């Protein structure tokens, strides 16, 4: 199990495939995605890596976090996230993951915070059909109708679909295809829509319901450097 990455949603556009068909894609950008910390079985009871992405102003970073980033020898990060990995895919602190971590045609799972819609009725929130427009109906055209039964059970069951706050929740979309990557600009183009607004942070992982392509880099797609070469050598061993 490889590490995922943190990317920023830039928006949507379209590209053309070899057949001349246009493909709607969401553009995700990886900027300075470094490994900030490790989690090991001996010390933490599980294996994972903590990644940091983006750039944060030093004056807006707490003293404790400045020490955390200094220990990893990386600049203060705007976003941190942790990814579970298998022991053979554990990455060294300080290495940088690039967009080449994913390959074209690969399936990934993306996680983000959906766009908030505020307080919404059941027709918008749960796709209810609503009531009749006329023939004796008054005021209840868009209401949800009955909420329960009678004295028995004498309550409204948990999970009843009703009006309420819509959106702004953690959403994961599975099996999205990677159309292409651009390691020079740190871009990942995935087919279709991705939850979240423009500028939102998105977590991208290998799909759990699809096999990993054989040409996918292991333990990760790393930026060339001394630390990257050392990590690749350890992974090969």
From Swiss-Prot:
GO CC annotations, alphabetized: cytosolic large ribosomal subunit
Composition skew (Low complexity), residue ranges: 220-237
Ranges for region Disordered: 133-155, 213-237
GO molecular function, one term: rRNA binding
Residue numbers bearing the N5-methylglutamine modification: 151
Gene3D superfamilies associated with the record: 3.30.160.810, Translation factors
Protein family: Belongs to the universal ribosomal protein uL3 family.
Subunit structure: Part of the 50S ribosomal subunit. Forms a cluster with proteins L14 and L19.
Designated name of the protein: Large ribosomal subunit protein uL3
Organism field: Brucella canis (strain ATCC 23365 / NCTC 10854 / RM-666)
This protein's encoding gene: rplC
């Amino acid at each position: 199990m490889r590490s995922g990455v943190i990317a920023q949603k830039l928006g949507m556009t379209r590209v053309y495939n070899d057949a001349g068909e246009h493909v709607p894609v969401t553009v995700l950008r990886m900027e300075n995605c470094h490994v900030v910390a490790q989690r090991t079985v001996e010390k933490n009871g599980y294996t994972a890596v903590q990644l940091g992405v983006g750039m944060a102003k030093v004056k807006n970073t707490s003293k404790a976090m400045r020490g955390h980033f200094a220990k990893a020898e990386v600049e203060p990060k705007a976003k941190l996230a942790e990814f579970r990995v298998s022991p053979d895919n554990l990455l060294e602190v300080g290495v940088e993951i690039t967009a080449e971590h994913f390959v074209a045609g690969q399936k990934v799972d993306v996680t983000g915070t959906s766009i908030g819609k505020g307080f919404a009725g059941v027709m918008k929130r749960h796709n209810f059909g609503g009531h009749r427009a006329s023939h004796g109906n008054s005021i209840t055209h868009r209401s949800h109708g009955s909420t329960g039964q009678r004295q028995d059970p004498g309550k409204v069951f948990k999970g009843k679909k009703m009006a309420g706050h819509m959106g702004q929740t953690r959403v994961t979309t599975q099996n999205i295809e990677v159309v292409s990557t651009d390691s020079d600009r740190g871009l990942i183009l995935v087919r279709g829509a991705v939850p979240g607004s423009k500028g939102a942070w998105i977590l991208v992982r290998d799909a759990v319901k699809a096999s990993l392509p054989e040409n996918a880099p292991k333990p990760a797609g790393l930026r060339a450097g001394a630390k990257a070469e050392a990590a690749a050598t350890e992974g090969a061993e």
